[in-house]
Amino acid sequence: MRTEIVEIYSDATNAAVLRHPGRHFPGVLVQGDSLYALCRQADEACEAARGVLDEDAYDELNALRNALWSYLTHYKVVLGEHEIPLPFSEC
């Protein structure tokens, strides 16, 4: 872990906008529990869309779901490395 100064443009709950040093454009900070909820929602959307959407559309939806889960997996690994408990239950 390191500490750096970031520019905070908005600290809205679950949608903080900040710029990390070295980045040209700001990004959005999504809290871990919100990211987990988005992953679960994407799972449900894929389940509901299977057999309903055409193959290309389903593949795009599934790619979105996989990208979200990839972010969540990275988040969980980093928190684990720093012995920080997850802000959600995976039960």
Model-derived features: positions:
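Short N-terminal "domain-start" leader segments
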Residues: 1-9
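A broad, low-specificity signal marking well-ordered, structured residues that form hydrophobic/aromatic
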Residues: 6, 16, 28
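Short aromatic-glycine-(Arg/Gly/Cys) micro-motifs in beta-strand/loop hairpins
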Residues: 10-24
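Generic structural motif
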Residues: 23, 35, 89-91
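A short, exposed loop/beta-hairpin motif centered on an aromatic-Gly-Thr core
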Residues: 25-33
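A short, charged, amphipathic alpha-helix used as a generic interaction element across diverse proteins
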Residues: 34-47
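Short, charged, surface-exposed hinge/linker loops at domain edges
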Residues: 46-91
